[in-house]
């Protein structure tokens, strides 16, 4: 006779969202430039210094815009400093931590109000249950 076991638990999607909510208040209150992305790469929370550094408007957290969907103007390291192609933009540390589930560190360039800035970014994936719930990134101006 077959044997069936049933186990009920919170779905990974719910536990992933709970993980992001757990980090939301500390990120928003942080004096450090930090950014919290959800599992889809959308901006979940930002600190005031992060918004200033990346040129993000107040209230960006409520819109849940994707980081590479025009929220931040990422530029290349070339002399012309053109817009970073999407395939390259998806390799920046906050998204790399989401995609690999591992720590990611690297330099990136952003343009805010026409002023290019080079930033050092270190990102860690956040886990909710068995899934990657998001990533937490800290920035430092180079």
Tell me the role of every PLM-derived stretch.
Residues 2-9, 23-25, 30-100, 130-142:
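PAS-family sensory domains
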Residues 38-39, 112, 141:
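Residue-level signal for short segments within beta-strands and strand-turn junctions
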Residues 60, 68-69, 128-130, 141-142:
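Short, intrinsically disordered/low-complexity patches at protein termini
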């Amino acid at each position: 006779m077959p044997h069936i076991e049933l186990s009920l638990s919170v779905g990974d999607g719910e536990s992933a969202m709970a993980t992001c909510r757990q980090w939301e208040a500390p990120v928003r209150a942080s004096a450090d430039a930090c950014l919290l992305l959800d599992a889809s790469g959308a901006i979940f929370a930002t600190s005031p210094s992060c918004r200033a550094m990346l040129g993000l408007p107040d209230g960006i957290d409520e819109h849940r815009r994707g980081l590479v969907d025009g929220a931040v103007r990422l530029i290349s390291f070339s002399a012309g400093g053109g817009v970073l192609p999407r395939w390259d933009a998806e390799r920046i540390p906050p998204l790399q931590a989401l995609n690999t589930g591992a720590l990611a560190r690297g330099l990136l360039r952003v343009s805010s109000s026409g002023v290019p800035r080079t930033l050092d970014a270190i990102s860690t994936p956040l886990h909710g249950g068995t899934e990657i719930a998001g990533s937490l990134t800290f920035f430092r101006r180079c």
